[in-house]
Amino acid sequence: MKKCVYFLFLVIFVNYNVINASEKISLISLNDIKIIFSTDAKTWNQNLVFLDKKLSMKKLQLDNNSNYSLKTTFSNGYVVITPYFKLDLVESLNINYYFNSINKKNTDSVINHFQSLDKDLCNYIKIDKNDIFIDIKNC
């Protein structure tokens, strides 16, 4: 139950920060990433069913994943958070930021933030048109 409450606060926090991204991009914290990595598939899916009722949040079922993804919209685009599970544990976390109008400030903020995370996390960052893709794994 405690994990569910933390997870709910995490999602609300991410949603709040992404909505305010038009002025300043506030990105998911290291602590929030660690919470996601400690969440099992069942808990993740149960929480997203509940959060799907929020106006700015939507659960998605991607073709290549049996678990849900979380899509949160903000004024300049959206973010999709997708954990990939192996044996019911998060093996990798995919975060996709899409900006309606992307600029150097947006890309630099995202890249610098994710490159400065914990040394125990390995990141792969790819920029393609208006998307910034971040894949995170435990090293």
Map each language-model feature to its residues.
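Short helix/turn-capping signatures at newly exposed starts of structured segments
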Residues: N17-N123
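Short, low-complexity, Pro/Ser/Thr/Gly-rich segments in the mature regions of secreted, periplasmic
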Residues: I132-C139
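Short, exposed beta-strand-loop hairpins at the edges of beta-sheets
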Residues: N123-K129
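Beta-strand-connecting loop/turn residues
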Residues: D88, N130-I132
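Classical Sec-dependent N-terminal signal peptides that target proteins to the secretory pathway
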Residues: M1-E23
